[in-house]
């Protein structure tokens, strides 16, 4: 009996039932009833955005794989700077956006430059607080394997010097000079010239002009005080540089004893001479103008004067920038 009943049930699955007039079609046994009405649907771990203007959730988009998303995110933050300049969002914003100095897209890098200009025009002190991170990634860009990233590195340096030049030259005077020499292809003291970029006439003159202008600004901030930059009076500068200032005055900048490195740990450089890095210069504190000028005269000035003479003879925009740099060097060191 049981076997015959199962056979009948199996046969019913393959039989087409006759529809009767006036009666609806029967529903399947596994049909789901969707006729219920609910006022709310609760989904775990999913919440509606209560504040559509909250920019903290956009920070992760700065690491998005799409170039347009990164660019649009930088533009959004740039437009929002006036309203968030005094908020706690600035620190994570700069921490997430500064690595874009080495971004593969030129549009993203230009968007970051515009963002830095917008922040600096509202409050330059914020850029000064993140000066170390800026210098770190600028140095990385100067030695980057991609030529375009390397060429744009001095753009970031020029814009950073415009808002916090004194902070930059005090902390990384020698490193930045070595980096600018590298992108110009001039070779540095203690290094092989073939290791740097070879300077040829085929190189884009536009980028050479940008590099020379960045070097001009770096030397201007590193070897001149604020009064000399504004007035252009060299006599007062040389007179004041030799006088002993009151050591008990409140310093003009934060962390005046940072160069002593009392609470920092540094990695030991093994065989620094063989690697081509002058460890003495890199560890030298360049807090004052006199020290920076002495380092520049001893290590960099002869090379700069030799190279700019060649560029001046070639003429063009590069020649103008080189002549401008030559005038500055004569004003400071002659």
Swiss-Prot record:
Subunit field text: Component of the RIX1 complex, composed of IPI1, RIX1/IPI2 and IPI3 in a 1:2:2 stoichiometry. The complex interacts (via RIX1) with MDN1 (via its hexameric AAA ATPase ring) and the pre-60S ribosome particles.
Family in the record: Belongs to the IPI1/TEX10 family.
Keyword Transmembrane part of the UniProt annotation: no
Protein's recorded name: Pre-rRNA-processing protein IPI1
Principal place of residence: nucleus
Keyword tags: Nucleus, Ribosome biogenesis, rRNA processing
GO molecular function: chromatin binding
Biological process annotations from GO: maturation of LSU-rRNA from tricistronic rRNA transcript (SSU-rRNA, 5.8S rRNA, LSU-rRNA); pre-replicative complex assembly involved in nuclear cell cycle DNA replication; regulation of DNA-templated DNA replication initiation; ribosomal large subunit assembly; rRNA processing
Gene assigned in the entry: IPI1
Function noted in UniProt: Component of the RIX1 complex required for processing of ITS2 sequences from 35S pre-rRNA.
Other noteworthy facts: Present with 4420 molecules/cell in log phase SD medium.
InterPro entries: ARM-like (IPR011989), ARM-type_fold (IPR016024), Ipi1_N (IPR024679)
Entry's localization field: Nucleus
